Regions:
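Outer-membrane beta-barrel proteins
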Residues: 1-196
Length: 196
């Protein structure tokens, strides 16, 4: 007798979310001679797609992915698109783990919170890095505290047994405000950064 074993499961339909922004600005500045001029230009337009809840019903681990590109709406040449984010990962009740081109927690949770003058270059604050390829990121939230970490392994360090760069931030809400503390270590330059 030949027996067949059938596995019954119900696959969750992954949620696919397309998104984008058209960001254009009109500014009035002065040149180096003090002469006023107006300029109309792209200010960071983007398009992307996010995929969440890739998994099987009842599973405690699900998948996710994101692909986002910057769109230079003023470009008449061949550099219209610029890679922003491109990653895949797994999510569980312990946290999420992802690999690819991702944003830096130090910038997301500390430096990026004070970048209020984006029109003029966002020079009001210092950011360690905004996005990096060749990265592995882990995030988890427990008891109101969120831990975000990223490690970059791009082969540029002479220390072959370690990450080339890594960061960690701990964040929470206090009296309605986001509070974060973070550490970033650039192994290549042998420089460490702290931020609050």
């Amino acid at each position: 007798a030949i027996g067949f074993v059938l596995f019954a499961y119900q696959a969750n339909a992954a949620e696919i979310i397309p998104y984008g922004s058209f960001n254009y600005k009109l500014s009035n500045d002065e040149n180096s001679s003090g002469k006023s001029y107006s300029k109309l230009e792209d200010n960071g337009s983007s398009i992307g797609v996010e995929v969440i809840d890739l998994g099987v019903e009842g599973d405690t681990i699900t998948g996710f992915a994101k692909l986002e590109v910057g769109v230079d709406t003023d470009d008449s040449g061949s550099d219209t698109f610029d890679s922003k984010l491109a990653y895949v990962g797994l999510d569980s009740n312990m946290g999420s783990l992802s690999v690819g081109r991702q944003s830096h927690p130090f910038t997301d949770n500390i430096g990026g919170k004070t970048s209020i003058f984006n029109v003029y270059g966002g020079g009001s604050d210092w950011n360690y890095g905004s996005r990096s390829s060749n990265s592995m990121k882990f995030s988890t939230t427990q008891s109101g505290l969120t831990l975000d970490t990223i490690g970059i392994v791009d082969g540029s360090s002479t220390n072959t047994n370690a990450f080339d760069e890594f960061e960690v931030t701990i964040s929470t809400k206090l009296l309605g405000s986001d509070i974060s503390v973070g550490y970033a270590d650039d192994v290549n330059s042998d420089i460490s950064y702290w931020g609050v």
